[in-house]
Every structure is written in C-alpha cells, then in structure tokens.
A protein has these predicted regions:
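SH3-family beta-barrel domains
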Residues: 32-58, 62-71, 178, 182, ...
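Active-site loop architecture of trypsin-fold serine endopeptidases
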Residues: 231-236, 273-287, 291-293
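Surface-exposed, glycine-biased beta-strand/turn segments
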Residues: 147-235, 266, 275, 298-342
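Acidic, Ser/Thr/Pro-rich low-complexity intrinsically disordered segments
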Residues: 21-25, 33, 37-38, 81-138, ...
Length: 345
C-alpha cells in the first residue's frame, strides 16, 4: 500500500470515526463500554464494518479470542504492528485464585498508535469469555485480582492503519501483604492440603515459621471481628477483609494485641507469634488461613506469594521487528514456543 493511499484512507477513517463519536446514543449514555467496544461501535455506526479493512479488524478481534498463544508467566514480548493489515494477538496464561495480574504495554518513542488491551476469563462452560479488565493508550497498564484458578486471555489490538513496535509484559503479584513482619513466602514451612491427624483432615492454610514474639500483622485493611482462644488454634484473631470479601485467620499466637470491632490497616500488629493450641509440640509459627464468602477455606499461598521477577528481555534486536530478514544458516529450527526447550515444528 503506497504512502499516499494509506494517508488518504487514514483521513477518511479518522473523519468518519470522529463524526460518529460526536453522536451520543442511548447505549453510550447508559451502558459503560470498554475502549475496544466503543471503537468497534463507532466503526459500525460509520458503516466501516462493510468495508474490507473494517471487516478484517472486527474479524481479527474475534479470532484472537479463539486462536491464542499459550504463555508462561512472567511473560515479556516485543512485537510490531503493521499498518497495512488489521491484526490482533491473543495470549493465554494460567493464574491462581488470589493472584494479582499486572499487564503493561509500552510503545516505541514517537509512535502514536492507539492500542486496546482486554483481559478475559476463559471457562469451558461459558461462551463468550468473561471480560475482566481493559485499557487503551490513555493508560497502557492495569491490574486485577483473579477470583479463581483459571486460564485467562489477553487480547492486544491496535486501531486501524497504525504501525509501531511494542513491548508487552504480564506478571503476577500478591493481592495481600505478607502476614508476618520481616518475612516472605520463603518462611512458609507447611502448605495447603497437607494431611493432618493421620489423614483425618487436611491443612486448610499455610504455616509461616518465625521466632517467638515476631509480630503477626494485618495483611489487608479491615475490621477485627473475633479475638478468641480455641483448642486447635490456641490464641486466634479473625480479620474481615471487606475489600476482597474474605476473612483472614491468624492462629497459634503467643499474645493477642487487638480487640473485636477495632479497625486496622495493612502492617498493624495483631499479635505475636507462638505455638498455642494444638501446635504446642512444634516450633513457633503463624497458621494463616483465608475464608471466602460462600466458598469456605481457600489456599492462601497465591495471595501472599512474592511478585514475579521481571521477565527476561527478548534477544532479538528490536529494530529488526517488522522487517524481512534472511537466515544465514543452511538449517533453521522453527519451534513451538519462544524458548529453546520447546520442540521443533
């Protein structure tokens, strides 16, 4: 496509979309749309869905939800958008309940392309995928908390007739602060699901080992709902995390330092670590549990696990992206994924 033709097409598309964007509809007034949905609606209102390029853009958006690349987190990719064709990319990744997913996209300096980011939850029993979060070039970064162990999908799509290089990053982070002062997930010595009492019950939490008297701290802002002593948990504290709709359980404390009805902030000391209750024969530790409304106990580890380290940058020179290159070796391996350990095609 020549530069003059491309410039003319862009001007036509821009004028049509701008004019259409000024017309408020009942749907636009009363229904909140994602940036991608709003752009697609303006395409249709302008009649551009009846043009080849408009149809290709809408088809690419749907295709990215069905045909996507399976990636392992943390993930980073540098890519190139070509102006002469409509495109969209889909990335599938596995997440655990309680993990925060952080997504960001950066464009090369000088690029004015508008790019749409949309995250979805995939459920084999649900069609279409459930939208989770979205963004465009006004804020090319967002995060959300996973509500279940599930596969998610990120769609990345630029607007029509724009080109540019981009770098995409998808990383995981905890949704809660760590509940023991000065420690992290390395201090977890017993995990969810381990047999207890000769297999009569399962461990419904994680055990975080620390010296006696180490502060057990609020992992979220909330309200203290119960301060008690029980045969199994010993000295316990319950914290209602209203932001996430869950209760946090602190057990085997040596001392309780809060009262029912007390409001606490992240990092406030709730008690001191000990080995009360049925932990009398074990070293001092905090039993930390999470109970979600309508779900009961869930695995706390993904909620407090350390954030992913920054993913490795691609080894390909970014200036080569979008260009044709010739392979010098007589034989070149085409692999199923972007790492050496993937099988050859």
């Amino acid at each position: 496509m020549s530069f003059r033709l491309r410039a003319s097409l862009y001007l036509v598309f821009f004028l049509l979309l701008t004019a259409c964007g000024k017309q408020q509809t009942l749907q636009g007034l009363f229904q909140k749309s994602t940036p991608h949905e709003a752009y697609a609606r303006r395409l249709r209102q302008a009649g551009l869905d009846r043009t080849a390029l408009g149809r290709d853009w809408l088809a690419a958006a749907d295709r990215a939800l069905r045909d996507s690349l399976l990636v392992t987190l943390p993930f980073q990719e540098t890519g190139y958008f070509a102006a002469e064709r409509a495109m969209a990319a889909g990335y599938r990744y596995q997440v655990r309940e309680g993990e925060t997913v952080r997504i960001s996209l950066t464009l090369d300096q000088g690029s004015d392309a508008r790019v749409f980011l949309d995250a979805f939850e995939l459920d084999p029993e649900r069609r279409p995928p459930r939208p989770l979060a979205s963004a465009d070039t006004t804020a090319l970064a967002f995060s959300y908390v996973s509500e279940d162990d599930r596969q998610h999908l990120l769609r990345v799509q630029p607007e029509l007739l724009r080109a540019g290089r981009f770098t995409l990053r998808i990383q995981r982070a905890p949704s809660l602060s760590f509940p023991v002062k000065g420690k992290n997930d390395v201090a977890v010595g017993s995990f969810w699901g381990v047999n207890r009492d000769g297999g009569a019950r399962r461990h419904e939490g994680i055990d975080i080992f620390a010296k006696r008297g180490t502060p057990a701290v609020a992992a979220a802002n909330g309200l203290i709902t119960r301060v008690d002593e029980t045969p199994r948990g010993g000295l316990v504290v319950w914290l209602a995390d209203t932001e996430h709709g869950q209760h946090l359980y602190y057990a085997h404390l040596d001392k309780q330092l809060v009262q029912p009805g007390q409001q606490v902030l992240i990092g406030d000391t709730l008690g001191l670590i000990g080995n009360t209750g049925n932990a009398r024969t074990t070293p001092p530790h905090l039993h930390f549990g999470i109970y979600r409304g309508g779900r009961g106990a869930v695995d706390p580890f993904p909620f407090v696990r350390r954030a992913d380290a920054p993913p490795a940058a691609p080894r390909t020179a970014p200036e080569r992206l979008g260009q044709w290159v010739r392979v010098q070796d007589k034989r070149a391996d085409l692999r199923r994924g972007p790492v050496d350990k993937q099988a050859s095609v």
